[in-house]
UniProtKB/Swiss-Prot annotation:
L-serine binds at T237, A238, E239, E291, S390. Its EC number is 6.1.1.11. Catalyzes the attachment of serine to tRNA(Ser). Is also able to aminoacylate tRNA(Sec) with serine, to form the misacylated tRNA L-seryl-tRNA(Sec), which will be further converted into selenocysteinyl-tRNA(Sec). It catalyses: tRNA(Ser) + L-serine + ATP = L-seryl-tRNA(Ser) + AMP + diphosphate + H(+); tRNA(Sec) + L-serine + ATP = L-seryl-tRNA(Sec) + AMP + diphosphate + H(+). ATP binds at R268, S269, E270, E355, I356, S357, S358. PANTHER family: SERINE--TRNA LIGASE, SERYL-TRNA SYNTHETASE. The keyword Iron-sulfur does not apply. Pathway: Aminoacyl-tRNA biosynthesis; selenocysteinyl-tRNA(Sec) biosynthesis; L-seryl-tRNA(Sec) from L-serine and tRNA(Sec): step 1/1. Keywords: Aminoacyl-tRNA synthetase, ATP-binding, Cytoplasm, Ligase, Nucleotide-binding, Protein biosynthesis. It comes from Neisseria gonorrhoeae (strain NCCP11945). This is Serine--tRNA ligase. Homodimer. The tRNA molecule binds across the dimer.
Amino acid sequence: MLDIQLLRSNTAAVAERLARRGYDFDTARFDALEERRKSVQVKTEELQASRNSISKQIGALKGQGKHEEAQAAMDQVAQIKTDLEQAAADLDAVQKELDAWLLSIPNLPHESVPPGKDETENVEVRKVGTPREFDFEIKDHVDLGEPLGLDFEGGAKLSGARFTVMRGQIARLHRALAQFMLDTHTLQHGYTEHYTPYIVDDTTLQGTGQLPKFAEDLFHVTRGGDETKTTQYLIPTAEVTLTNTVAGSIIPSEQLPLKLTAHSPCFRSEAGSYGKDTRGLIRQHQFDKVEMVQIVHPEKSYGALEEMVGHAENILKALELPYRVITLCTGDMGFSAAKTYDLEVWVPAQNTYREISSCSNCEDFQARRMKARFKDENGKNRLVHTLNGSGLAVGRTLVAVLENHQNADGSINIPAALQPYMGGVTKLEVK
């Protein structure tokens, strides 16, 4: 959520920054709401002053034996009380309308974010590793994976399109990848491992920005036997739960930064993705991801963003996968982000790079929604900055390992860093 004080003091500047990311901020609507709010507040202050003045007169009138005048004054105070209750209701209505609107407004882009309308104008930062040249006809991960235990028909039979069953060697490799990622982040990068719920309420999703704007992207659930039919949601990412662990908290500054990680399934309806990536694991309704979250001092958040990107890169380097880092332009950033880097891994069968990690600094946007604060060196409570990043998407990493490390006979070389997690197995072979 944007800072309302910033909006009030620099409305035009905020509107201009939002326009950079393609959001048309309705300045006239905001001004009208502010005028209503101010009008009600002025009226409230006038009524309170009148009530206080008349209340002081009542005692004096009674002392002078002017009982009729005292009663009239008391009647006035009673009417003012009614008027104040109405003014409070009017102010509450204005505030609720303003708050609901603020929840739908995206974050302001950082000044370093390149301008652009969509993904075609993202800016490449660097490429790492050289895509392998194959001397045989390569296969995609579907053709490679199915003989090794990747079962798309089985997933469709159980749950419909965009679900997958893994068994045997592929299931083990998938598990090994997640375990390797967790160990790297906890043992080398200083993150604390968490296990968090996969079902959350609307307040939690509002805190990180998925609600109210992106409800159609979520899976909704209701509890059996719950007559109220309260809606809950399957998490789209562990960012939601990890970040919300500090909701409503005041963190001592010496405890910052907090570095959190979790391996979880992620559930997404892919409402706007009809017809995209219908083959294979690239776009699924259910997929696993190892998530990184940092809760940091505001002055250190952009250093933390670069660090987090490096942590995701270390996984790709260890798995010997070519990749590139890009800065998302203003028109391609996520709702809550002030700046985002995407890591894209080379996918040989598609002859292109595909997103495998997204690392974002949300500054105080999520913290304001969650009321997540820290106590600074002067004892003042201030909003923290929150960051999140994929470290990595496990299914897409599986795709990259299969395709980049394939052999002519359909076998898959296991990267050295992953072999301890595979019981020393160095190659997956069709049996």
